[in-house]
């Protein structure tokens, strides 16, 4: 019989092997917050294990081995993290990044290794969307490959993606955002504590109206927050999840990735998120379709909006403003975090050109040519009647006397006429 210690080691090894694949249920909170978070900006601290798929993406400085929180991310499985593409606008080298899993508290600028149950990992590969537009933040989505694979456990677990047939999320869902970003717009550095906030999904037509974002939002975005502001994501929350569920007890589904906004918690300037459902095929093409087996069942209600079109025309400036938090102050400090007071307004929409006039109708076919006139009646071919013998004899006598004759209006020489006349038979006078 094996000693108890050996059996315990075997059991732990089997559990660790199963957890290392992160094949368990997705979207489940290991510890619910009984108070329910209401804010990130000025908000409520999340308890450890409340959002086990949350990842802190940290800039690493080799000269002093320090790490600085910059963006959030979502754990999909033991090998991949989903985040925002704009986090890597200025930091694309894999050795510049570290990932911390299972954290509730983080220390900005620390050089200390993490302690269990937290896990620190390297970035093996950065995969940004091939049509990401840093000017408009279109297709603001990216994937990070984890090395070595991270094991799931009590405070680390995968997030759910929506079903490919579910379409856009319904507005009636309960949604949360979470992150270590700024707790107010002009904060000097990110929050050391994971914050959470409950937000409402806002209709895209309202969010795109003139007094709000004035046409900047595309069909591949989600708009979440409150019309009056006050509760919002902020700098340092980029790449983190917008998580929703329809009913109590159901798993949370990552419906969006924190992308951009104007300021933080401003009225009529809610947070803008990259919707995940339009990019499921792209994610599967990069990490394998098997990695999406944890997607929630399809929503019975058919989608209410069409799939996204492609891109907004580029503007003169980036739209800001949940860019990642300012990095280490030396040697390459990031710009001051205070955003521009308003996003660049896109040029006024021009009226569509009038449709070209219809082509003129084809001309009517020419009338058929008139029928040819009937041919004149053929000239009579009746031979002239022969002159009587007495008449011919009289004409001969006149010729012999030197006379001439006329036929109609045409003058005829009598000598030639006599030569052309019908030969007169010889007359013999009886003696």
Swiss-Prot record:
Pfam families according to UniProt: Trypsin
Enzyme class: hydrolase
Function summary: Acrosin is the major protease of mammalian spermatozoa. It is a serine protease of trypsin-like cleavage specificity, it is synthesized in a zymogen form, proacrosin and stored in the acrosome.
GO cellular component terms given for this protein: acrosomal vesicle
Active site residues per record: 86 (charge relay system), 140 (charge relay system), 238 (charge relay system)
Subunit structure as annotated in this protein's UniProt entry: Heavy chain (catalytic) and a light chain linked by two disulfide bonds. Forms a heterodimer with SERPINA5.
Family: Belongs to the peptidase S1 family.
Protein name as annotated: Acrosin
Biased composition, class Basic residues, residue ranges: 331-341
GO biological process: acrosome reaction; activation of adenylate cyclase activity; proteolysis; single fertilization
Glycan attachment positions: 19, 208
Residue ranges of the region described as Disordered: 295-385
Reaction(s) the record says it catalyses: Preferential cleavage: Arg-|-Xaa, Lys-|-Xaa
Lineage: Eukaryota, Metazoa, Chordata, Craniata, Vertebrata
Statement: the UniProt record of this protein carries the keyword Cell membrane: no
E.C. number(s) listed in UniProt: 3.4.21.10
A GO molecular function held by the record: fucose binding
Activity regulation statement: Inhibited by SERPINA5.
Transmembrane segments: none
Signal peptide (residue range): 1-16
């Amino acid at each position: 019989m094996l000693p108890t210690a050996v059996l315990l080691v075997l059991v732990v090894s089997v559990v660790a092997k199963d957890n290392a694949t992160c094949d368990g249920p997705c979207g489940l909170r290991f510890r619910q917050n009984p108070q329910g978070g209401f804010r990130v900006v000025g908000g409520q601290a999340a308890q450890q294990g409340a959002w086990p798929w949350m990842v802190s993406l940290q800039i690493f400085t080799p000269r002093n081995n320090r790490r600085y929180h910059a963006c959030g991310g979502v754990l999909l499985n033991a090998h991949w993290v989903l985040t925002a593409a704009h986090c890597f606008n200025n930091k694309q080298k894999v050795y510049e990044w570290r990932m911390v899993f299972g954290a509730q508290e983080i220390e900005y600028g620390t050089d200390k290794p993490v302690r269990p149950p937290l896990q620190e990992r390297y970035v093996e590969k950065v995969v940004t969307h091939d049509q990401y537009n840093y000017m408009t933040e279109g297709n603001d989505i990216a994937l990070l490959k984890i090395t070595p694979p991270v094991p799931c456990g009590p405070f680390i677990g995968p997030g759910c993606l929506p079903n490919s047939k579910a379409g856009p999320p319904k507005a009636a869902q309960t949604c949360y955002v979470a992150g270590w970003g700024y707790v107010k717009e002009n904060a000097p550095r990110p929050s050391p504590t994971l914050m959470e906030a409950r937000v409402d999904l806002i209709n895209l037509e309202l969010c795109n109206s003139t007094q709000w974002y004035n046409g900047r939002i595309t069909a591949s975005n989600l708009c979440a927050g409150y019309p009056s502001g006050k509760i919002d994501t902020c700098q340092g929350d980029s790449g983190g999840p917008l998580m929703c569920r329809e009913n109590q007890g159901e798993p949370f589904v990552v419906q969006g990735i924190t992308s951009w906004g104007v300021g933080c918690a401003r009225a009529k300037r809610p947070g803008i998120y990259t919707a995940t459902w339009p990019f499921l095929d792209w994610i599967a093409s990069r990490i394998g379709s098997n990695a999406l087996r944890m997607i929630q069942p399809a929503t019975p209600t058919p989608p209410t909006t069409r799939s996204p079109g492609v891109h907004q025309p580029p503007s003169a400036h980036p739209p800001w403003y949940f860019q990642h938090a300012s990095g280490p102050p030396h040697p390459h400090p990031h710009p001051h975090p205070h955003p521009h007071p308003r996003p660049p307004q896109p040029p006024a929409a021009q009226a569509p050109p009038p449709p070209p006039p219809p082509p003129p109708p084809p001309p009517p076919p020419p009338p058929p040519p008139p029928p040819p006139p009937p041919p004149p009646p053929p000239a009579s071919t009746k031979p002239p009647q022969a002159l009587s013998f007495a008449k011919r004899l009289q004409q001969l006598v006149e010729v012999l006397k030197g006379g001439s004759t006329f036929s109609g209006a045409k003058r005829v020489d009598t000598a030639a006429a006599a030569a052309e006349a019908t030969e007169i038979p010889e007359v013999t006078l009886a003696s």
